[in-house]
Regions:
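C-terminal low-complexity, glycine/proline- and small-hydrophobic-enriched intrinsically disordered tails
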Residues: 1-192
Length: 192
């Protein structure tokens, strides 16, 4: 089940298939992103089924372990009122239907203001995802540098490799500390 904007650009896709189980692996800091919550599944029983879209665009990416965001959220922005499409794909056959998201009658702001707010929230979400992805890449690279340090122990070039790896680790840590508070306590927002 895919939700699309009026131009046919994909917003979000849901499936009836259960996601595979998380692989058991290295518990180092270089883990892959894990979703904070399970995506709702599309029912697939014969007959009439119901699925409720929360009108949200995809969430921002998180770090692992998850960043504590006291003053914010990773939730994607709500769709603005307007025309959308939904596409149901079953056994290779697709069915598309247009629909309209209407403004709450209690809302007194203009469509332009709602669109400007949405555009800003989308930019913030994308920048937060970019920052969190960079942090995860830094952690992955730092983990690899540490592995090279360990592998090089006892070899002829061991000290040279260990020194180079230490320089890389130090530089990566400095970059990470510019992006996020690595020593933040649970009651502090870690994003710089």
């Amino acid at each position: 089940l895919t939700f699309l904007d009026a131009d046919g650009n994909e917003i979000r896709t849901f499936t009836s298939e259960e996601k595979g189980s998380e692989p058991k692996g290295d518990e180092s800091e270089a883990k892959e992103h894990k979703p904070k919550k399970k995506e709702p599944r599309v029912p697939k029983e014969a007959g009439t089924n119901r699925f409720i879209w929360d009108l949200r665009y995809p969430d921002a990416h998180d770090t692992d372990p998850p960043a504590v965001l006291w003053a914010g959220t990773l939730r994607g922005p709500l769709a603005v009122p307007g025309q959308y499409q939904v596409r149901l794909t079953v056994n290779g056959q697709s069915y598309t239907q247009p629909f309209e998201v209407k403004v709450d009658p209690r809302v007194t702001v203009s469509q332009e203001d709602l669109q400007a707010q949405f555009d800003l929230l989308l930019k913030i979400r994308d920048k937060l995802s970019e920052t969190h992805d960079a942090i995860m890449q830094i952690r992955n690279l730092r983990s690899q540098a540490r592995e090279w340090q360990q592998r090089a122990q006892g070899s002829a070039e061991g000290e040279v490799i260990a020194s180079a790896a230490e320089s890389i680790i130090k530089a990566l840590t400095e970059i990470e500390e510019e992006l996020i508070q690595v020593k933040a306590k649970e009651i502090e927002d870690p994003l710089n």
